Amino acid sequence: KIYTRCELAAAMKRYGLDNYQGYSLGNWVCAARYESNYNTQATNRNSDGSTDYGILQINSRWWCNDGKTPGTRNLCHISCSALMGADIAPSVRCAKKIVSDGNGMNAWVAWRKHCKGTDVSKWIKDCKL
């Protein structure tokens, strides 16, 4: 599923991401925009052989099991394919674990590059939340 910006903001809010670990909703919507372009089916292969999955590009080396990444830790106890469904609840649950892991949203390269230190409120502007 490809979400619209405001549709995703509403879903993320419903699942409790607004101000989770102190990160406003705009941060999460911005991260999703630059990680997956709001597409739940996005995948990207990494040079280490792992793959990133779903709207927040969650990595198979650490967080989910795709059956092909050697030595996966699967810290979210989930199959990577479950992170690619139209319902973002599994991705949100795993993202909450990731953001609580010590590095906050710095775990997402796209967030560091494009969202960190910017006015992220624009990402939820004009959304009926």
Swiss-Prot record:
Active site positions: E35, D52
Enzyme Commission number: 3.2.1.17
Keyword annotations from UniProtKB, A to Z: Antimicrobial, Bacteriolytic enzyme, Disulfide bond, Glycosidase, Hydrolase, Secreted
Keyword Transcription listed: no
A GO CC term attached to the entry: extracellular region
Domain C-type lysozyme: 1-129
Miscellaneous notes: Lysozyme C is capable of both hydrolysis and transglycosylation; it also shows a slight esterase activity. It acts rapidly on both peptide-substituted and unsubstituted peptidoglycan, and slowly on chitin oligosaccharides.
Protein's recorded name: Lysozyme C
Organism: Crax fasciolata (Bare-faced curassow)
Lineage summary: Eukaryota, Metazoa, Chordata, Craniata, Vertebrata
